[in-house]
Amino acid sequence: MADFILLNEDFSDFPIGEFPYDKNHSAMGEYHFIHYPGYYGKWHDPVCNHTYNGQGASWIISEYNGKHFMEQMRIRNDKPHRTFPMLTSGDRFWRDYTITASVRMFTTKWGNAGIGFCCQNSANLLVLVFEEHELRVEYRHKEEVTILDSVAFNYNCDDTYILKAEIKGSHVICSVDDKVYFDIDTEYAVQGGKVAVTATIPAQFGFVNVTTSESTAASIDAARNAYKAECENAQAHYPKMKLLKKIDLNGCGTGRQLRFGHL
């Protein structure tokens, strides 16, 4: 039976330039996700960059010989605290899938680059990354990183590497260029979740493919629909939002000064 395609991304639909981000470093954007103008495709940037120094976008779309790439451009990931820039795709219900992606790093002196999987959110996921001249499979929880397994790997800036992670229940098999490096069992894989490209150094991603079986795809849809029905049932027990008052600000913004008490 043919694999069911969850994601088939080569970034060709993206215009050359910046992936959407909060260019104004707004107060709202500091605490909330805002859908900024621009093309997102099937991707979401869950890691805001608020260093207020005009550093620009975390991610850009570049082109070489007619092929598009998604590039990570953020070279500081320690302010205001340790962060892991990433783009995610999919949802929390994805599970038992295979992710394959290409990555080329533009420095080997520091930082990491690779793929994420079983992402419940940007602070709870598994990653397969190159770092400190090793290939590592890690569990990230908030700022803490647990190395589940590692092996020496002499990577460079000239080659493009094909990373692959196959997840089935708690079983994870990780490969680079069709060579298996890790075959582990971990409870962190059972949760399933989104996929990601992630890097703390300038790095270039050429494609991301995610596949699963037809039966698993059907069970993913069933779980998603069941959760939606559960939420709608819970919401039905509470009163709906009702407009009580409108205030004309005469063209002025609210900044941080307008609170519910003012209404």
Predicted segments, located by residue:
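Flexible glycan-contacting loops in extracellular carbohydrate-active proteins
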Residues: 184-209
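Short carbohydrate-recognition loop motifs
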Residues: 40-82, 244-245
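Secretory/extracellular carbohydrate-interaction modules
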Residues: 65-141, 251-255, 260-262
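Extracellular carbohydrate-recognition regions
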Residues: 1-52, 217-253, 260
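Intrinsic-disorder/low-complexity, polar/charged segments enriched in Ser/Thr/Lys/Arg/Asp/Glu/Gln
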Residues: 3-8, 96-100, 104, 160-162, ...
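Beta-strand-rich interaction surfaces with strong enrichment in secreted/lumenal proteins
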Residues: 85-91, 149-155, 195
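Carbohydrate-binding surfaces in secreted/extracellular proteins
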Residues: 11, 101, 157-185
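Short, aromatic/His-centered strand-loop micro-motif at the edge of beta-sheets
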Residues: 141-162
